[in-house]
Amino acid sequence: MAKKKTLKQQDFQKKKLKVGKPKQAASNATDTSFVAKTIHLPNQTKLTSTNDAEADLLRRLSLCKHHSEITRKETLIYLQVAVPRVIHGQVASRLMSACIPLMCDPNKHVREELLKLLDVVGSCDANTMRLYMRPLVLFMGSAMTHISAGVQRDSGRFLQCVLRHAGHELVRAAWVKMLRGLCNVLGWPLRGAASASAGAGSNVVSMHKNRALQHQNLQALADFIRLGCAEPAAAALAGCAAPALYAKYLLPDCPQPYSHLKLFVREFPADTAAAARPLHELDTLVCEDAATRRDVFLGHFRPVLAAQLPSLVKDGGDCGRVAANLLQLLDHVQQAAA
């Protein structure tokens, strides 16, 4: 026992250096006094560079979730150049799925580059915007109710971008949701909403500090109402009348060609109009035709706009000009429904 104890103590004793002799090497030291002409890496798989544009794009899509806003911004700038080459390929699906959530990005410059990217996608192929209408509506609604005031104020710009390229699909798919979201962004409480006065105060304060962004959201609201409440143009109807004999044998242009049969739609009773029902019950209402959209707008949203717009007209400026045009649009919609 005494011998083992002595050996253990020697392990922790520091050996004294002797004069003229070098320091003793450690027991686990690695000898590096050799020269190698080649180094072999057994796990190396990539030996040559690739020029595949789609493969490079897929690698860059993962950077959309990078923690650095500069990296996310530069990735979106690169995608703007690459979109015309890959918009009709399989990578377009992953591109849209990776970029659309950036509508709620906290950085302003990232949102600006995403807006440019969506504009490029719509210019190259508007059908891609129509195909991804559901996630676009989902994240636009999330941006309109976001806790960040900057994300809320920029939601109107994304709405205008989608209106330019797939406006008719947007008004049919999310008429009530977009109107409710825009009123929330502008700070206008709605009657019958679950949280009518919950977030109105903060939105009003933030909007008054950013008159230019308020002007953009008012313009987005005007464009959305004008497109949703207008009847189809006479020229478009005349163009559809010529191939009426064989049109029923072709692929439909609208997403729900048999909606007029109302097979999966809950109809309201004849004595209960859509405008008379609470606002939170209109989420299940199908707004495929302009008449239904006008009834919903006149019953739930027109009184709110008519009460809020005159004060903006008195303030003048760009907001006052858009507010005056909105008041004229309200009268036009009222006359069209009469």
UniProtKB/Swiss-Prot annotation:
Coiled-coil segments: none
Source species, domain of life: Eukaryota
Pfam families: Ipi1_N
Entry keywords, A to Z: Nucleus, Ribosome biogenesis, rRNA processing
Record's keyword annotation contains Nucleus: yes
GO biological process: maturation of LSU-rRNA from tricistronic rRNA transcript (SSU-rRNA, 5.8S rRNA, LSU-rRNA); pre-replicative complex assembly involved in nuclear cell cycle DNA replication; regulation of DNA-templated DNA replication initiation; ribosomal large subunit assembly; rRNA processing
Record region (Disordered): 1-25
Keyword field contains Heme: no
GO MF annotations in UniProt: chromatin binding
Localization of this protein: Nucleus
Primary localization class, coarse: nucleus
CC per GO annotation: cytosol; nucleoplasm; nucleus; rixosome complex
PANTHER family recorded: REGULATOR OF MICROTUBULE DYNAMICS PROTEIN, TESTIS-EXPRESSED PROTEIN 10
Quaternary data: Component of the RIX1 complex, composed of IPI1, RIX1/IPI2 and IPI3 in a 1:2:2 stoichiometry. The complex interacts (via RIX1) with MDN1 (via its hexameric AAA ATPase ring) and the pre-60S ribosome particles.
Biological role: Component of the RIX1 complex required for processing of ITS2 sequences from 35S pre-rRNA.
Record family assignment: Belongs to the IPI1/TEX10 family.
Protein name: Pre-rRNA-processing protein IPI1
Organism of derivation: Eremothecium gossypii (strain ATCC 10895 / CBS 109.51 / FGSC 9923 / NRRL Y-1056) (Yeast)
